[in-house]
Amino acid sequence: MKVFFAVLIALFVCSMVIGIHGGVPINVKCRGSRDCLDPCKKAGMRFGKCINSKCHCTP
């Protein structure tokens, strides 16, 4: 049972790392993540967040 939980946690951490690095920065300035929703949808991505005053979009 301990091995199962260890594998489950490892898969969860790996999926988070892949999700974080899957972001694509676009050349749109933002002040908050809410400003990135429409530009990211226009770029074909579902999610967006504001990092260092630039929008980063993820599928």
From Swiss-Prot:
The keyword Signal applies. Expressed by the venom gland. It holds the Pfam family Toxin_2. Residues 1-22 form the signal peptide. GO terms for molecular function: ion channel inhibitor activity; potassium channel regulator activity; toxin activity. PROSITE patterns: SCORP_SHORT_TOXIN. It comes from the Eukaryota. Keywords: Disulfide bond, Ion channel impairing toxin, Neurotoxin, Potassium channel impairing toxin, Secreted, Signal, Toxin, Voltage-gated potassium channel impairing toxin. Disulfide bonds join 30-50, 36-55, 40-57. The keyword Zinc does not apply. It is found in: Secreted. Its main location: secreted. One of its GO terms (cellular component) is extracellular region. InterPro entries: Scorpion_toxin-like_sf (IPR036574), Scorpion_toxinS_K_inh (IPR001947). Inhibits insect potassium channel. Is at least a 100-fold more potent against the Drosophila Shaker channel than towards its mammalian homologs Kv1.1/KCNA1 and Kv1.3/KCNA3. Negative results: does not affect mammalian potassium channels (Kv2.1/KCNB1, Kir1.1/KCNJ1, Kv3.4/KCNC4, Kv4.2/KCND2, Kv7.1/KCNQ1, Kv7.2/KCNQ2, Kv7.3/KCNQ3 and Kv11.1/KCNH2). Also weakly inhibits Kv11.1/KCNH2/ERG1, Kv1.2/KCNA2 and Nav1.7/SCN9A channels. Has the structural arrangement of an alpha-helix connected to antiparallel beta-sheets by disulfide bonds (CS-alpha/beta). Belongs to the short scorpion toxin superfamily. Potassium channel inhibitor family. Alpha-KTx 03 subfamily. This is Potassium channel toxin alpha-KTx 3.10. It comes from Buthus israelis. The lineage of its organism: Eukaryota, Metazoa, Ecdysozoa, Arthropoda, Chelicerata.
